[in-house]
UniProtKB/Swiss-Prot annotation:
Keywords: Transferase. L-tryptophan binds at F85, I86. Pathway: Secondary metabolite biosynthesis. This is Indole diterpene prenyltransferase nodD1. It comes from the Eukaryota. Pfam families: Trp_DMAT (PF11991). InterPro entries: Aro_prenylTrfase_DMATS, DMATS-type_fun. GO terms for biological process: alkaloid metabolic process. The lineage of its organism: Eukaryota, Fungi, Dikarya, Ascomycota, Pezizomycotina.
Length: 431
């Protein structure tokens, strides 16, 4: 019996199961992906204290608008139809919980794919993203696609050009060359959406650097970009500096909001940077943009980042802050930062992504480290035991034969305190 049949005939106990039984699936591919996404979604929303009605609302959105963007299920040999580098196991959706202001919020990140991805009809997987963002317009009336259309015109290629570009890089590079990614947050009674674009294919086509491509396309927004220029100039100053060169950090992609309402009447611009350096001093230099970002909030952020760094990553005892950690040779083993630009802001806001999958401690030690971090930040009474909730989530998810291993710890410090995020994956390789 396939995954879809198993779900639609299984005893009902959880909202994700009830939804499957009541609605069924368009095809076996969607049934397969729901069987992998449903269990961790249910457990993570229980962990985050979502009410039953809120779980149904979120699940209905994911079922209707994200599930079709997962593409074909893996073949009989376990190989994914189109591997994407959103997570270490190449699956098309990544799930996460964001801890902030006493609440936990479910997040998803998705690189849309379809049965045409990688074929002559869509050689580098562009059309699925367009289809996905148009599909969700019916339930996101505040969605504004002006910026999306601008950047798509800057980054997307016609089929013949895309096919030609594909022959110029190796297979891994093709998979890393994500043209577009959609991310969703699910606060109470709401859906927020971000879209990210990556300059890799345009760099192959033009020979320009990521920085040149990203800056040119952002400045191409014309008058829309004026409120962001001060913060963008600060970021550019560091990007071109000797400090950035020593830290081995470079911009790799950017994102913006598409649902413009309430606190997001104007989009943020988030520019993401990558480095393979892992010395903590280098992390501080990047986080503070070489000292351009200052003040008590930044200092508190650095201090909290150091606690989390040592709590979740496998940092040897007595390891010097100016020395890189023992190198992980995987091509995706890197630290990612993003710098958030708000309209009218003088400076960017930093965020660090700690590579727990490549440099982290064992799972349960990470969970202990998170409990220690929450206690150090005075948050242990707010969120409860991280380890206890993690173990409950993990053990029950594995009952459904789905992997849920933390792959990245994301750290952001606002004036109201730290915002750690746990990212999990759903991995066919563990079935």
């Amino acid at each position: 019996m396939d995954a879809a049949s198993t779900l639609t005939h299984a005893p009902v106990s959880q909202p994700w199961q009830s939804l499957a039984q009541g609605l069924g699936f368009v095809n076996e591919h969607e049934g397969y992906w729901w069987s992998k996404l449903g269990p961790p979604l249910g457990k993570m929303m229980n962990w985050a204290r979502y009410s039953t009605s809120e779980q149904y609302r979120v699940l209905a959105f994911l079922y209707k608008y994200l599930l079709p963007a997962c593409g074909p299920k893996p073949g009989d040999d376990g190989e994914l139809f189109w591997k994407v580098f959103i997570s270490y196991d190449y699956t098309p959706i990544q799930l996460s919980l964001n801890f902030h202001n006493g609440k936990m919020t479910l997040r998803t990140a998705n690189i849309p794919i379809s049965d045409k991805s990688g074929t002559a009809d869509d050689p580098i997987n562009q059309q699925a993203s367009v289809d996905a963002i148009i599909r969700q317009e019916r339930v996101l009336p505040s969605q504004d696609l002006r910026w999306f259309n601008h950047f798509a015109s800057q980054y997307f290629f016609d089929k013949d050009t895309a096919a030609s570009l594909k022959t110029k890089v190796d297979k891994l590079r093709v998979q890393q060359g994500v043209q577009c990614m959609l991310s969703h947050d699910f606060p109470e009674r709401d859906v927020q959406c971000k879209v990210a674009f990556c300059p890799l294919w345009k760099a192959v086509a033009t020979g320009l650097s990521n920085k040149e491509i990203i800056w040119d396309s952002i400045l191409g927004l014309g008058d829309d970009i004026i409120p962001y220029k001060r913060a963008l100039a600060v970021l550019e100053q560091y990007t071109s500096s000797e400090n950035a060169a020593k830290a081995g950090v470079r911009p790799v992609f950017f994102a913006f909001d598409t649902v413009l309402k309430d606190n997001y009447k104007s989009s943020r611009i988030k520019i993401y940077y990558l480095t393979t350096r892992t010395a903590f001093n280098s992390m501080v230099d990047i986080y503070t943009l070489g000292g351009l970002l200052k003040g008590p909030d930044i200092q508190k952020g650095v201090e909290a980042l150091e606690v989390l760094w040592k709590a979740v990553l496998n940092v040897p005892e007595g390891w010097p802050d100016d020395k890189d950690l023992p190198m992980n040779p995987h091509r995706c083993a890197a630290v990612i930062f993003n710098f958030e630009l708000w309209p009218g802001a003088e400076f960017p806001s930093p965020k660090a992504y700690l590579p727990a999958h490549y440099y982290g401690r064992p799972d349960l030690e990470i969970a202990d480290g998170m409990d220690y971090f929450f206690k150090q930040q005075g948050l242990d009474g707010v969120y409860g035991s991280y380890k206890e909730n993690y173990l409950k989530c993990l053990s029950e998810v594995r009952t459904h034969r789905t992997n849920s291993q933390p792959s990245t710890m994301i750290f952001l410090f606002h004036s109201k305190g730290p915002m750690p995020t746990l990212r999990c994956t759903t991995s066919p390789s563990y079935l």
